[in-house]
């Protein structure tokens, strides 16, 4: 299984004379001790509990320039390693190839569900909305930011009468209750294997847990109203962490039930302008923080300690990513946990916000994909184009090239082929 979780606006790494605040101090082994001592001031230290399962990859770059908008061009290339369209251009530019999640879904997904799970959390301001998942050239896949909608698709109740769905919502009736007779008949079949029974039980047990989270009460109305008044719209910023965690829970659930083999989660829109509230403090708009000024352009008053605030947001994304790792670790398999059988990837569509660089794109991987990836390591890919990163992930997922060897041809054909050997166990 594979999931890409995308953060916007680059990370607070060394750039334009700013200090390093994202990566560990030294290449090589990553341990819980190092992340809680010498590297405790770095954003990746939020993942210290999973140090032995981490693979941190620096030294990759996008292969092509943007076309009038750094954010759009970065989003176009992030999961596609494809060129950016000539037309449309600017903030409307599109990728000229399929995305890695699309390739995985076509090769590995169950026949009943050929599409990747494409999720979203946060605002859609309209300037640049979805950026990640492509069926092919200029064919951008829409993302779902409604956890209830995603949930009903996963458990297959989208065709239920509206009154039944409303009953589930209003009365918190369990879906298990609605199909209990069918469940009992299925579980009692003599030809059902033990593994199938275990998978079904995981499915049934997880339903109630997710229902409780999906149907929980929102924060008090006065708190939401205060955020709405400050932000000027409907409270999406105040809920972004909550919705992100719900979507992550659904990704883990979908993997555990083999609903899909691959998912993407885009947090925030193309130039994420969320005002994050962290530890009770509401920060300026994230996009402006990444520019270091109170502006979405190149002129404005400086934001005090802007890189420090960017670092705080990086840490928040690290905490959210850890939540996903926690959820994937909840599900046991024959050889360990669902995380061990997967690779979860925290990524970005820029290297650093202040320069909008397409160099040194951060990839934070967790899970070895069944032992393929070399974990507990921080490696430098050597300034290669990031198609080689995706080739390595595709190979970890069991895909091959036409000769039966590691995938080496993902992305635009102008890019050099190959994998990143340092990532492979």
What are these regions (language model features)?
Residues 1-425:
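Ligand-binding pockets and gating/stacking loops
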